[in-house]
Amino acid sequence: MPLEDTDTDARTPYQLPFPQDALQEIVIPKAIPDDERVWVPQAENVAFRPLCLNRSQGYWMNLLRVRKSGVLSRHRHPQAVHGLVLRGRWHYLEHDWVAEEGGYVFEAPGETHTLVVPDDVDEMITMFQVNGVMLYVDPYGKTMGYEDVFTKIDMCRAHYEKVGLGADYVDQFVR
């Protein structure tokens, strides 16, 4: 809806209270952390850094970091996924496009693909928002495993406890 009046005091902060049950915002000053312990290992040379683990709406946002070339995984998304490539590049075997540094990718619901990091890429970091579940599948669609926001939270708790940050370190990212 277009503005009906002119805001004559645009630099005055909002003066009313926020809704009583509104969740706190998440502010992460350094999304790509210096502390290696913040990265949660997912496989050899593959880790993620949680940004928002939204258990009430069933999605997660994270940085995916891959420090190897080759096939990462084949998976299906029943819901939409958004990605922003921060470092390096990658592609899917099923498509002829390449996701490059600075590029944005929308993955439509129902998409199944095989993520590959090229041989000449030392490090790839992509920010992903994954909605719902990610199903790991074989080439013929048979489900071999899954991830959702709850498995992500569990992985974080176990890792952060192990590296000395404490299992509750993940709580700052959970909404």
Identify the meaning behind each predicted range.
Residues 67-69, 76-94, 100:
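Glycine- and acidic-residue-biased ligand/ion/polar-headgroup-sensing regions
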Residues 1-58, 143, 154-157, 161-175:
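A short, N-terminal "cap"/entry segment at the start of jelly-roll beta-barrel domains
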Residues 90-114:
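Short acidic-glycine-tyrosine-enriched beta hairpin
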Residues 117-118:
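Asparagine-centered strand-capping/turn motif at beta-strand->loop junctions
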Residues 105-106, 121-139:
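A short hydrophobic beta-strand segment most commonly corresponding to one strand
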Residues 48-50, 61-63, 82, 104-106, ...:
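Conserved hydrophobic/aromatic beta-strand scaffold that supports enzyme active sites
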